[in-house]
């Protein structure tokens, strides 16, 4: 969706309203996240977002293939840079093991363009974030999945 700046004297049309004020915000756009400590290999990624003004709504799904691998804390890039000072600790996801077990996850903001996928665990009666690795929250293998979705204010 192309951004439009309205100036004095412009006429707001039905098309403008549908494009800029609707919760639909236009068509979903795909993006290719940049991964850190994760090699997609022959896995499949579906990463989509839409923009409504400065609001970015996004969703991400990664299904592991036989050559997908994890070597440390999983990080991925956002589709559009976030406004400075925004924390993403309210972005939730799920890690799904090929056996069917599901693990709740929270994405931690590393920068305005990168999130880190952390698992959630209970330690001493408290819920804490735990960094992912090749064996956390489980040993990653073919058909495992990572799901995330979120919304945030873009930088521009």
Language-model regions: role of each:
Residues 3-4, 8-14, 18-156:
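Surface-exposed molecular-recognition determinants
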């Amino acid at each position: 969706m192309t951004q439009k700046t309205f100036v004095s004297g412009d006429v707001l049309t039905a098309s403008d309203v549908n494009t800029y004020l609707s919760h639909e915000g236009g068509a979903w756009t795909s993006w290719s996240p940049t991964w850190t400590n994760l090699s997609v290999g022959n896995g499949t990624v579906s990463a989509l977002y839409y923009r409504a003004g400065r609001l970015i709504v996004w969703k991400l799904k990664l299904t592991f293939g036989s050559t997908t691998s994890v070597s440390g804390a999983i990080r991925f890039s956002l589709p559009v840079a976030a406004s400075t000072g925004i924390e993403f600790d309210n972005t939730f996801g799920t890690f799904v093991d090929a056996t069917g077990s599901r693990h709740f996850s929270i994405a931690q903001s590393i920068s305005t363009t990168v999130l880190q996928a952390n698992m959630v665990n209970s330690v001493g009666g408290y819920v804490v974030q735990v960094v992912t690795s090749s064996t956390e929250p489980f040993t990653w293998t073919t058909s495992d999945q990572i799901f995330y979705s979120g919304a945030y204010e873009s930088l521009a």
